[in-house]
Amino acid sequence: MEKVSVETLIKDLNLEVIVKAENNKIDITTSDVNRPGLQFAGFYEHFAYERVQIMGKVETTFVEQLPDEVLAERADKFFAYPIPCLIVTRDLNIRQEIIEAAKKHDRYLLRTKEASTKFINRLINYLDEKLAPQITIHGNLVDVYGIGVLLLGESGIGKSETALELVKRGHRLVADDAVEIRKIGEDKLQGSAPEIIRHFIEIRGIGILDVKTLYGVGSVRNSMSIDLVIQLEEWDEDKYYDRLGLEDEYIKFLDVEVPKLTIPVRPGRNLAIIVEVAAMNHRQKQMGYNAAHELNKKLLKQIGN
């Protein structure tokens, strides 16, 4: 199971630490959040204590009206649950009873200056990305005309050389050799490079190249959705290759299907141009036009006449 430490959350979202948990640290395992207004009112049935707890203006206003003894009792019960942390938004005041209860039970108590809705949206997006299922595969990922193209194939087939030629033609490199794939939401895949090799590319006979330094910041990007997979393979005279584009092929990563094309490689074929055209044709299909289907309709119509 993927998880995020509260320390990482504090650093990445620039949160103010009011109380720091020293020995009772609980990792975050879900991107869902809970607003504990009902809990401070004394209702604990179906309490989602495993979620990040968020107190906004409504919850804080309610808490401000509670007598000291009542709040102390309810805060003590609230922090007795194994919550990862409690975050107060809008830089609102935090009553001493809540601070003391957080210290007693060794829980994180944090604060942000952001408004509740804005912060919750940012928090959920952040946790969705951090907690997303992930795999690492051998391949190259390039942003071609806004389409994330994942190049697959055996070592030495020409993936890196094709990616470099695409960069030279104005497209952007995302990852070379190793691509980390995360599942974002129900049906979206996002790819990136491991941080240690980000923006580097290996070309046999030359070695390691820093694409960002050679071609500028506009030649790279940190992550990209995976919209199209292109499998490069040695040309096999005995194998049938689709010449019309009527048959759709897919490949599955993390239970998400992605359109796939198989492109045979042999001397004289300009793979970079073929990948460019494949990306443009994919975008055209997304916009509702399929050239192969249109030609097939015209042929059937002519045969019918």
UniProtKB/Swiss-Prot annotation:
Catalyzes the ATP- as well as the pyrophosphate-dependent phosphorylation of a specific serine residue in HPr, a phosphocarrier protein of the phosphoenolpyruvate-dependent sugar phosphotransferase system (PTS). HprK/P also catalyzes the pyrophosphate-producing, inorganic phosphate-dependent dephosphorylation (phosphorolysis) of seryl-phosphorylated HPr (P-Ser-HPr). Its EC number is 2.7.11.-, 2.7.4.-. The active site is at H138, K159, D177, R243. It comes from the Bacteria. Homohexamer. Its cofactor is Mg(2+). Mg(2+) binds at S160, E202. The Walker A ATP-binding motif also binds Pi and PPi. It catalyses: [HPr protein]-L-serine + ATP = [HPr protein]-O-phospho-L-serine + ADP + H(+); [HPr protein]-O-phospho-L-serine + phosphate + H(+) = [HPr protein]-L-serine + diphosphate. ATP binds at G153, E154, S155, G156, I157, G158, K159, S160. Keywords: ATP-binding, Carbohydrate metabolism, Kinase, Magnesium, Metal-binding, Multifunctional enzyme, Nucleotide-binding, Serine/threonine-protein kinase, Transferase. Both phosphorylation and phosphorolysis are carried out by the same active site and suggest a common mechanism for both reactions. It comes from Caldanaerobacter subterraneus subsp. tengcongensis (strain DSM 15242 / JCM 11007 / NBRC 100824 / MB4) (Thermoanaerobacter tengcongensis). Residues 264-269 are annotated as: Important for the catalytic mechanism of dephosphorylation. This is HPr kinase/phosphorylase. The keyword ATP-binding applies.
